Amino acid sequence: MKRKAEKQQATAPVSAFAARKARQQQARLLEPEKTAQNEPAVEPPSKRARRSPEEGAARQAANENDRVQTRRSARTKAETLSSAELAEKQPQESAAAARAQTAERTPPPEKGDADTFDAAEEEEEEEKEEDILERENGVGVIAVEDDAEGYESPADDVPQVQNFPLSKTRLNKSNIVSSDERTLCVRIKEKMTLVLLGHYDLWVKRGVISLMGAKLHPSPRLYRVYAPSTHSLPVIKCVAGVDGESEIEVKSCNSGIYRLRHLSPLYQRIWNGKHTAADKLTLKKVSASTKRTFSVLYTSSDDSWNRHLRPLHLEKQWSSAIRSLSQRGGRLKVLICGPKASGKSTFSRYLLNHLLSPAPQTENNHRNTDGVAFLDLDPGQPEFCPMGQVYLAHLRSPFFGPPFTHPSLAESQDGSIIRSHHIGAISPKEDPDHYVLAAMDLMDRYRALLASYPQCPLIINYPGWIFGLGLEVATWLVKSLGLSDVVYMSEKGPAEVVEPLGHAAQEARVPLTTLPSQPTDFVSRSSAQLRSMQVQSYFHMSHPSEIHNPQWLDTTMSRTRPLVVDYAGPRQGIRGIMVMGSQISPNLLHEALDGALVGVVAVESPNAIMGQADAAGFSGSSHGDATQGAEDLSSAASDIDMNDVTDACHGDVAPTSSSSFESMIIRTPNEDLPYLFVGSGSCNPLDPKASNCLGLALVRSIDVPSRKLELITPIPASKLRDALEQGHGIVLVRGMLDNPSWAISEDYYAARAAERRHQELVAKARKETNTRDGQDAAVDADTQGMVSALLKDRIRRASNVPWMTVIEDNSRRHREAAQRKKSLWKLRKKAYPGSESETDW
């Protein structure tokens, strides 16, 4: 497996522009030195050395002969060699001089750029305050080498932030209907656009607008929109209006997702920053400290943090393909495939929203009441589930936001997961046979769904695994799934991929549509970082029943109440623990399981291991025992106790079924953990026909004396109750997912955030000391000192956790890690490099 290129190192802890100029100047200084060192002493330099103006004038005045020129060339060469030796002895002084020259040449900010300068100063101060956490290659900062399946590389030459147009509509008195500290109501003319950064609720009052593929008509419903800087910004466009205009109202929302910035640096500076020019215009009548959860942007230069912002525009060929596919209605069964970073997920999201667009209330046309089925076969970048899973979802409403804003559909009113399978890896190539069986089982579930929703179309999102064995799997799916269409997201081939797909589509009598890939070249988060953000969002998201939209909590994993379950004894709640991949010694199961992400899988049959004969059921327990165990599980607002699964699953079990499952369990010698392993060399996975993944869990601790596991999981109690009512057993599957380093560093980042908030309060209190009594001010100062000491002690304790090191110096490694957080990632779009290695792409 090839290692990806390291990020380009910063030469000095200055701004990105100054650092780039310093590198360029240093390269110019070292370039003639390297040339001189590599040349033989008897040959003249390949490029004539630069002469002084005096020498040039003298040469023009007097036409010297060849002997003089040769002597002068030799003298110039000797001077070049001596300068190279001097630079070789003092490389640090040369770099320092270059940085000093760059600092001197950097002009001070003009008066009109005060907001931008203040934002840059604020960013530098925040970077100085934050320590860099490292666990091997860095906690909280995902190392490049860790993302073996990634499709981006660090940008060697980071492009300068360009003034990119975003909104065509300019707000003024004529199109602003109303505005206050939370709401903005505006009119948009036909074919005009408006782009907002942040998260907000959108209400269409008049006219028809398009947003991320969906056409929204006037209705009383509010649509939640998430527009972070990590992805291209959604564009609100008026497609039809009353008197040529549409009217929308945008409201601030309190989803709590912004609180995740206190737990991870990946969530910092992804929402709206300081007030833009449009914000200042619409907030004239309110306090200057008022801030909405969204900002209107005319161009990318309006952003106070100078981020790489781009609008989410739809290609014309994409639009025509979406219109053509949507005309098939309930007969649509489309497979979307293509190379990595080609826009498969974006196109799938646009098509999904277009099919789920609500019909206008004034028309009597056919309305899609059966929803849309979404079969996600990409375990590395799933849309509605955390990583490592393939699933079938039934959706009833459009979604506006990246995957980390809807990492789960549990208890959601907009959709549900019909069935899910835990692959245990971010790439299907780890076990293609299991992957294909999981896809076929999900397709069978879709056919069963058609009995209740006959007009439900199907969208299949295939991963970027399109070469080698992945191409064979894709062509087999095209021939076997009974599709209506196949979409390939690349016009540049290669032919060795397009031709087999075309032959498979022709054999299945399915049209193949080829579309251009996405125009985006740079992203601000790598695929590994986006996976980390999605999993962290998954564990911190909740969906209260009394509200429509989800909420996020900033409670760290260490302070979250765990689910406690016995793994041995008469009240055993976990039937087995499986480790996918290569076989490990039972003595190492404790180390492999502790602190890992595991899949919580409901086993529907005792013969659920692939290759075994099917059995009638997992147990012979009565329905009454199962219901009793489920009622104990779902005790409201109290600890979920999975130990009562014993009552649900241990009844009059058939001897053959019990012995069949128990014979596969190996008890570890020291911890007595139920190690489930079947196979030779690698463990056979669970059969998709007899298993269903309920979600992910984090193994917080293993209490060996009491034989208990502490699990942190967002799986609703109702989902566990349903599994137990049906007599299913619970198996934990340890796969090859990314290590949850974000969970280890949450306490540290939370402690630093608390300290910063306290420092802000202290600074605010000091400004008010002149108007207060001296004795009261002294008491407040003592209290503030005590609080500061407690917060520092909290930071110290949070930084002393295992597998984490806090670096507080200003070393080169510190600066490189800080620069890594701000860098861009360049997408690799070459479909085929002429190599047989699939890991390169």
From Swiss-Prot:
Residues 16-28, 92-105 have a biased composition (Low complexity). ATP binds at residues 338-345. InterPro entries: Clp1/Grc3, CLP1_P, P-loop_NTPase. GO terms for molecular function: ATP binding; polynucleotide 5'-hydroxyl-kinase activity. Residues 812-831 have a biased composition (Basic residues). Its main location: nucleus. Residues 1-133, 812-841 are annotated as: Disordered. Gene3D superfamilies: P-loop containing nucleotide triphosphate hydrolases. Its EC number is 2.7.1.-. Residues 115-133 have a biased composition (Acidic residues). GO terms for cellular component: nucleolus; nucleus. PANTHER family: CLEAVAGE/POLYADENYLATION FACTOR IA SUBUNIT CLP1P, POLYNUCLEOTIDE 5'-HYDROXYL-KINASE NOL9. Polynucleotide 5'-kinase involved in rRNA processing. This is Polynucleotide 5'-hydroxyl-kinase grc3.
